[in-house]
C-alpha cells in the first residue's frame, strides 16, 4: 500500500518480483506517543514556534494519511496510530484555538474527492463516527450519553441501543427519485463525494427501482459496499491462476472496485452492499433506526441481518463478545461494532459535534495475535531516502490473510520492541489491516536454533552504497542522502509520478516502475532520472527484462526467471512487439502532459506538498515560474500552505537537479501554468464562498472555478470566516449553519451579481434571500436525520 506522497508495496501481498524492497517510506515523522493534556486555561496561551511547527506538521501528516486511505485505498498506518495522531492534533487545538483553520482535519470528515470522478454534493452531510478502542472507553461513552439523555427531561428511563456490526467497506450514498436510483456517490469529505453511479449499477442486489410504495419523492440511502470473505478468497485464487497479483484485502478491493474507470471491470468484482440509514428525504417519517431498517427492507434494499436493539450496557457487552469470538468466520469482514441510540427524537436532541454524532459510537476490536518466526530483518529505501527496516517472517495466517512481512519503522522501534533475528514473535494486524510485530516471545528465545542475533542497521544504502546518515540532528530516521542517483529512491519517485493524485498514469504501476529503474537487464536502465520520463521511446524498452517468480498451477515455486516486461516474448512466426499495456503507457504519458498545474506539483515529490497544498499554490500563483520565484513569505501567506510547506518548496527548488526536472518536463510539453482569463475581474479577492445545493446555471465545478478565477476561496464548509453561502435547490445543512452563524445567504441571481460586481452588488440579493426564508428556501421536514457513514 502507499502513503499519498510515498509508496509502499502491500506488506502482505506477494508481488512475485524480487527487489528486496517492500516496506514503507513516509515523508513526515509520526507524532505518536504524545500524551493528552488538560486545556482549561491553555487557550489563552500564545503558541510557541515549536508548537506551531508541530501543529502544522501534524495537519499535513493527517491529511496525507487521509489521502492514502480515502483516495489511494491503501492505508499505511493502523486505525489506532491514526487516532493517536488525530487526538494529539485535537489536544493542540484545544490549547491553542487560534491555530484552528476551517479546513483543519478536525473540522472535516473523510477525504478529498478524486479528480478522476465527477464531484457531487450530498443533499445532507455524511458524518463519520467517533471510535473507541477499549471496553472501558465504550462504557465511559455510554455513561456520558445516558447522562445527556437524562438531562433532556422527557421522563425516559434510558435509551434503547441499536447495536450492529461495523462492516469494513466503503461508505456509499444512493439517491432515489420517485423510487428510481439516479445517483451513487462516495462519502468524500462528508459534503461532497465522487460520482460512482455507473459502477454501483453493476451491484445486482441494489435495486434500480424500489419495490412497494410510500417511498419519498426524493431520498438518500446510506450504506456500505464490501466484498464477502469467501468471494474475496475465490476472486484472488482466480487472479493467481491467471498469473496476476492478488488483491491485498477485502476493504481496499471494494474501494478500488468502485473507483474503476471501466464499469465492466467493476462488474467482475463480487461486490455487495448493506444499507444502514437515510439522509435527506421528502415526506418520510420513521421514528427509529430499527423502524428505518424495516422500511428499507420493504423497499427491496439490502439490510444487514446482524443487528439487535438492546436495553443495557451488559447486553451490549455480550453482543460485542459474541461477535468478537466469531468475527473471522462471518460472511464479511468487520472492523468493530456500532452502537446507536435507536430513537430518532433522542438522536436529534443529542445532536452533533463538527465531525460526529453524539448519539453513536464505533467500538474497535483489539487486533488478533499469532506467533511466527522472524527469519530476517531487511531494509527498504523509500522515495525521500528514508531507510525503513522490515521483518521477514515465516508466512502465517492472521485476521483472514497470510502475512510474511511487516514494517518495523526505524531502528529505535526495533530496539524498543526488543526483537532479534530468529525470535518467535507476536504478530497482529493493526486495525485488522496493517501487519505489525508486537514483540518477542522471550520464553522461547533460548530454544531457537540457530541462536538469535541482533539486528544491525546498515551503514550504507543497500541500493546505491552511499553512507547513510540521519536527515537532521536528533532525527531517528536514517536516510540515504543520494537523492538524485539512488535507484531505489528513483523507483519510488517514478511510481509516485504515476499515482492517482499526480499524473494518474494507470499503466505505470509498481512493477513497471521497477522495470524502468531497476531492471535485471540491461545494466543501464531506461530511466536514470524522472526528468526523462516523457522522452522514453518504445525502442528504449525493447530489451528490458525483470526477474519474475515462476508459478505452477497458480502456486509460487520459489524459482525466478528473466522475462521481457514491455514487449511480448516473440516467436519465429510472431516477432516481439510492445504489449497492449506498453502502448497504453505511451498514450497516457502524452495525456499526462496536459494535466493541471497542481498535479504537476504533486508529481515532483516535494516534501509535505500534497494535493491540497498544490491546489492552493496553483490557484494563488497560476504558473510554475511564479511559484519558483515567490519568496518564502509569499508562499507561506497562501491559505493552506504555511511556513513548513513554504520552507520545503524553497529548499526543493534550490537544488539544480530538481529545477532540471521541471525544465525538462516543460521542454517536453508538460503544462506548467493554468490558463488565466485576464479579462475576468478579481471581484472576490479575499472572500470565502460556500456553494450548497443545485444551481440551474452552474455545475459544482463551474461554480467553484468561477469563484477561484475571481480571486475567491471556494470552501466546502461553513464557519464564522465564511463570507457568503450560495444556496440552490436541495440546500442542506450548510444552509442551516449559515443561518445560525449569520452568514449572508445568496440565491443564484445573487451569486451572479457577486461574481460580476463584488460584495456591494450582492447585498440586495442577500437581503432578498433572507426575506424569502418563510417562502421555503432550504426548508426540510422536521424529521430529517443525518445518518453517519460507518
Curated annotation (Swiss-Prot):
Transmembrane segments: none annotated. The active site is at 166 (n6-amp-lysine intermediate). Its EC number is 6.5.1.2. Belongs to the NAD-dependent DNA ligase family. LigA subfamily. Residues 777-790 have a biased composition (Basic and acidic residues). Gene3D superfamilies: 5' to 3' exonuclease, C-terminal subdomain, 6.20.10.30, BRCT domain, DNA ligase/mRNA capping enzyme, Helix hairpin bin, Nucleic acid-binding proteins. GO terms for cellular component: cytosol. PANTHER family: CHROMOSOME TRANSMISSION FIDELITY FACTOR 18, DNA LIGASE. This is DNA ligase. NAD(+) binds at residues 79-83, 128-129, 164, 187, 224, 340, 364. One of its GO terms (molecular function) is DNA ligase (NAD+) activity. The gene is ligA. HAMAP family: DNA_ligase_A (MF_01588). The keyword DNA repair applies. The keyword Glycosyltransferase does not apply.
Amino acid at each position: 500500500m502507499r502513503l499519498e506522497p510515498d509508496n509502499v508495496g502491500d506488506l502482505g501481498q506477494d508481488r512475485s518480483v524480487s527487489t528486496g524492497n517492500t516496506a514503507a517510506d513516509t515523508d513526515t515523522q509520526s507524532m505518536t506517543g504524545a500524551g493528552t493534556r488538560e486545556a482549561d486555561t491553555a487557550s489563552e496561551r500564545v503558541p510557541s514556534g515549536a508548537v506551531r511547527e508541530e501543529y502544522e506538521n501534524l495537519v499535513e501528516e493527517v491529511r496525507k494519511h487521509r489521502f492514502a486511505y480515502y483516495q489511494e485505498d491503501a492505508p499505511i498506518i493502523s486505525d489506532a496510530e491514526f487516532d493517536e495522531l488525530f487526538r494529539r492534533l485535537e489536544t493542540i487545538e484545544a490549547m491553542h484555538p487560534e491555530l484552528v483553520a476551517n479546513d483543519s482535519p478536525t473540522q472535516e470528515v473523510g477525504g478529498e474527492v478524486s479528480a478522476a470522478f465527477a464531484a457531487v454534493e450530498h443533499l445532507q452531510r455524511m458524518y463519520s463516527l467517533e471510535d473507541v478502542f477499549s471496553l472501558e472507553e465504550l462504557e465511559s461513552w455510554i455513561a456520558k450519553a445516558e447522562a445527556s439523555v437524562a438531562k433532556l427531561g422527557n421522563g425516559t428511563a434510558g435509551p434503547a441501543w441499536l447495536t450492529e456490526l461495523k462492516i469494513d467497506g466503503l461508505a456509499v450514498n444512493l439517491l432515489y427519485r420517485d423510487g428510481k436510483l439516479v445517483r451513487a456517490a462516495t462519502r468524500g469529505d462528508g459534503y461532497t463525494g465522487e460520482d460512482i453511479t455507473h459502477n454501483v449499477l453493476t451491484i445486482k442486489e441494489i435495486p434500480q427501482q424500489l419495490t412497494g410504495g410510500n417511498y419519498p419523492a426524493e431520498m438518500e440511502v446510506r450504506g456500505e459496499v464490501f466484498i464477502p470473505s469467501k468471494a474475496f478468497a475465490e476472486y484472488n485464487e482466480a487472479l493467481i491462476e491467471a498469473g496476476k497479483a492478488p488483491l491485498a484485502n477485502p476493504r481496499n478491493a471494494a474501494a478500488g472496485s468502485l473507483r474503476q474507470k471501466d464499469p465492466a471491470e467493476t462488474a467482475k468484482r463480487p461486490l455487495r452492499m448493506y444499507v444502514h440509514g437515510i439522509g435527506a428525504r421528502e415526506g418520510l417519517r420513521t421514528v427509529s433506526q430499527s423502524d428505518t431498517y424495516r422500511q428499507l427492507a420493504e423497499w427491496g434494499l439490502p439490510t444487514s441481518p446482524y443487528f439487535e436493539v438492546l436495553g443495557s450496557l451488559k447486553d451490549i457487552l455480550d453482543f460485542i463478545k459474541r461477535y468478537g469470538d466469531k468475527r473471522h468466520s462471518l460472511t464479511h469482514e468487520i472492523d468493530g461494532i456500532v452502537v446507536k441510540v435507536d430513537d430518532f427524537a433522542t438522536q436529534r436532541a443529542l445532536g452533533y459535534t463538527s465531525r460526529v454524532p453524539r448519539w453513536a459510537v464505533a467500538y474497535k476490536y483489539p487486533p488478533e495475535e499469532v506467533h511466527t518466526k522472524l527469519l530476517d530483518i531487511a531494509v527498504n529505501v523509500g522515495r525521500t531516502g528514508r531507510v525503513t527496516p522490515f521483518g521477514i517472517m515465516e508466512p502465517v495466517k492472521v485476521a483472514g490473510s497470510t502475512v510474511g512481512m511487516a514494517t518495523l519503522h526505524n531502528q529505535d522501534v526495533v530496539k524498543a520492541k526488543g526483537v532479534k533475528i530468529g525470535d518467535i514473535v507476536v504478530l497482529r494486524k493493526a486495525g485488522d489491516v496493517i501487519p505489525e510485530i508486537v514483540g518477542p516471545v522471550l520464553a522461547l528465545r533460548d530454544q531457537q536454533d540457530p541462536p538469535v542475533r541482533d539486528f544491525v542497521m546498515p551503514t550504507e544504502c543497500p541500493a546505491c552504497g552511499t553512507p547513510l546518515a540521519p536527515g537532521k540532528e536528533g532525527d531517528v530516521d536514517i536516510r540515504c542522502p543520494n537523492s538524485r542517483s539512488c535507484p531505489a529512491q528513483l523507483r519510488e519517485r517514478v511510481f509516485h509520478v504515476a499515482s492517482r493524485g499526480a499524473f494518474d498514469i494507470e499503466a505505470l504501476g509498481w512493477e513497471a516502475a521497477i522495470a524502468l529503474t531497476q531492471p535485471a537487464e540491461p545494466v543501464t536502465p531506461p530511466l536514470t532520472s524522472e526528468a526523462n520520463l516523457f522522452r522514453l521511446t518504445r525502442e528504449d524498452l525493447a530489451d528490458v527484462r525483470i526477474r519474475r517468480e515462476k508459478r505452477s498451477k497458480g502456486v509460487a515455486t520459489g524459482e525466478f526467471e528473466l522475462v521481457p516486461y514491455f514487449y511480448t516474448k516473440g516467436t519465429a512466426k510472431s516477432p516481439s512487439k510492445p504489449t497492449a499495456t506498453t502502448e497504453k503507457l505511451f498514450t497516457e504519458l502524452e495525456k499526462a502532459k496536459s494535466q493541471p498545474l497542481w498535479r504537476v506539483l504533486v508529481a515532483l515529490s516535494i516534501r509535505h506538498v500534497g494535493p491540497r497544498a498544490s491546489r492552493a499554490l496553483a490557484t494563488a500563483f497560476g504558473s510554475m515560474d511564479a511559484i519558483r520565484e515567490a519568496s518564502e513569505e509569499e508562499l507561506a501567506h497562501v491559505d493552506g500552505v504555511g511556513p513548513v510547506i513554504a520552507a520545503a518548496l524553497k529548499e526543493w527548488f534550490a537544488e539544480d537537479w530538481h529545477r532540471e526536472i521541471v525544465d525538462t518536463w516543460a521542454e517536453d510539453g508538460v503544462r506548467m501554468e493554468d490558463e488565466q482569463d485576464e479579462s475576468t475581474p478579481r471581484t472576490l479577492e479575499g472572500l470565502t464562498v460556500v456553494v450548497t445545493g443545485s444551481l440551474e446555471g452552474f455545475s459544482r465545478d463551474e461554480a467553484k472555478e468561477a469563484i477561484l478565477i475571481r480571486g475567491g476561496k471556494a470552501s466546502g464548509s461553513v464557519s464564522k470566516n465564511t463570507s457568503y453561502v450560495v444556496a440552490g435547490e436541495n440546500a442542506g445543512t450548510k444552509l442551516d449553519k449559515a443561518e445560525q452563524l449569520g452568514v449572508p445567504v445568496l440565491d443564484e441571481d445573487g451569486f451572479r451579481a457577486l461574481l460580476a460586481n463584488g460584495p456591494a452588488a450582492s447585498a440586495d440579493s442577500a437581503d432578498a434571500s433572507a426575506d424569502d426564508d418563510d417562502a421555503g428556501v432550504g426548508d426540510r421536514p422536521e424529521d430529517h436525520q443525518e445518518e453517519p457513514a460507518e
